[in-house]
A protein has these predicted regions:
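Radical SAM enzyme [4Fe-4S]-AdoMet core and its adjacent flexible, acidic
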Residues: 59, 131-141, 148-166, 173-177, ...
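Conserved alpha-helical substructure of the radical SAM core
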Residues: 2-119, 123-169
């Protein structure tokens, strides 16, 4: 699966501009972490262990936007922690889009549907004829409850608060490390995979761009990842991010102390990474 044309052209334009001005080093992606707090404790994630002393720290909105301006990368990946917990995530996304950035929201999917309900509540009031069929479809597919419908039709609780709306420059980048059984084991909570799938389905009905974000570990079955991508293709997912699961000191210590697991059997080495990713190029051609 190739990058969408709009993204390819935007990034290519940035590369060409930097080359023409003689820049030897420049950023193409800014990884922005507005907070380190998360609502899951995924096995293998070093972030919430590495940043255990800064869980309550929250980066001011102005600093986030200034960081993007100073870096001047065409793409910003908002991660964390769980970025949808960030109190000003809507303002941050809209601020980055106003800077003409490509925005990826790297999320575990648990709060996605709530954010999309907020979007519906704002836009339904202004154009109920357009959005009522979408509400009916979402309800028919059990992606909205009767209570959700009632709240959306009432309109937003705070009309002045921004929302995250569909645009070709913004992607929900949903964390999925395998099919249902595997993913729920890794995130250490049952039902997370199904909630992610519900969120993806809702996002595609509403016209959002969606990508998946997958980490491959030593015990990951490559066939399962291929089946995952085939399944996501049936949902209309627009792209995939796939990366090797290297170890973090904090994650290794947590794995031993809290779970009693051997980190050497979980994280990838260089050789194992080459073996696991040998088929990745064929996936990209689908």
């Amino acid at each position: 699966m190739r990058f969408p044309l709009a993204l390819t052209l935007k990034i290519a334009g940035h590369l060409l501009h930097q080359k023409l001005r003689g820049a030897k080093r420049f950023a193409t992606v800014l990884q922005l972490e507005p907070l380190h707090t998360c609502n899951l404790t995924c096995t293998g994630c070093g972030r919430i262990r590495e940043y255990s002393t800064s869980m309550k720290d929250v980066m001011p909105l102005e600093d986030c936007l200034q960081a993007a301006t100073e870096c001047d990368a065409p793409m910003v990946s908002i991660c964390g922690g769980e970025p949808l917990i960030y109190p000003q995530i809507e303002a941050l996304v809209n601020g980055l889009l106003a800077q003409h950035r490509i925005v990826y929201i790297c999320t575990n999917g648990m709060s996605m549907r709530k954010k999309m309900r907020d979007y519906l509540a704002v836009f339904y009031v202004g154009n109920p004829e357009l959005f009522e069929p979408k509400l009916q479809q979402l309800a028919a597919e059990k992606l909205l409850t009767p209570s959700d419908l009632e709240q959306i039709r009432k309109g937003p609780k705070d009309p002045a608060k921004p929302v995250i709306a569909p645009t070709r420059w913004m992607y929900w980048n949903v964390h999925l490390d395998g099919l249902e059984k595997t993913h729920d084991i890794i995130v250490e909570r049952e039902g997370v995979f199904q909630e992610c799938i519900r969120a993806i389905r809702m996002a595609k009905i509403l016209g959002f761009q969606v990508a998946s974000n997958t980490t491959v570990y030593r015990e990951t079955e490559v066939d399962e990842i291929e089946h995952l991508f085939d399944f996501l293709a049936t949902l209309g997912v627009d792209g995939h991010t796939i990366s090797p699961g290297y170890d973090y000191d904090a994650a290794k210590k947590d794995m031993v102390k809290r779970l009693g697991l051997d980190p050497s059997k979980f994280f990838l080495t260089r050789r194992a990474t080459i073996e696991k990713f040998s088929r990745a190029t064929t996936w990209g051609k689908k």
